[in-house]
Amino acid sequence: MAKGQSLQDPFLNALRRERVPVSIYLVNGIKLQGQVESFDQFVILLKNTVSQMVYKHAISTVVPARPFNVTGHQNAQGGYGAQDDAPSGE
């Protein structure tokens, strides 16, 4: 895992896992809203009424709508997604 990913991945994964609504501001000023459905090294899949694939290089800021706990859990493929949704201990 690259050093720059050490905070980003657990942050995005906690948002995804807890289904926290987010506002994502792009570098061009556009505001997107929804829930993080999945993500990898380059993109975030944002779900609202439709799913949008947002390239990370176009993102300026990610703002959670409510407080949440950040803990890291990475799957064997090196990404985060539906396969690690089960609560810990199950």
Curated annotation (Swiss-Prot):
* Domain Sm, chain residue ranges per copy: 9-68
Q: Which InterPro entries match?
A: Hfq, LSM_dom_sf, Sm
Under CDD domains, the record lists: Hfq
Q: Where is the signal peptide?
A: none
Q: Which GO terms describe its molecular function?
A: RNA binding
Q: Which UniProt keywords apply?
A: RNA-binding, Stress response
Task: Cite the NCBIfam families for this sequence.
Answer: Hfq, PRK00395.1
Q: What's the family?
A: Belongs to the Hfq family.
* Its biological purpose: RNA chaperone that binds small regulatory RNA (sRNAs) and mRNAs to facilitate mRNA translational regulation in response to envelope stress, environmental stress and changes in metabolite concentrations. Also binds with high specificity to tRNAs.
Oligomeric state and partners? Homohexamer.
Q: What's the name of the protein?
A: RNA-binding protein Hfq
What organism is recorded for this protein? Answer: Shewanella baltica (strain OS155 / ATCC BAA-1091)
- Lineage, highest ranks first: Bacteria, Pseudomonadati, Pseudomonadota, Gammaproteobacteria, Alteromonadales
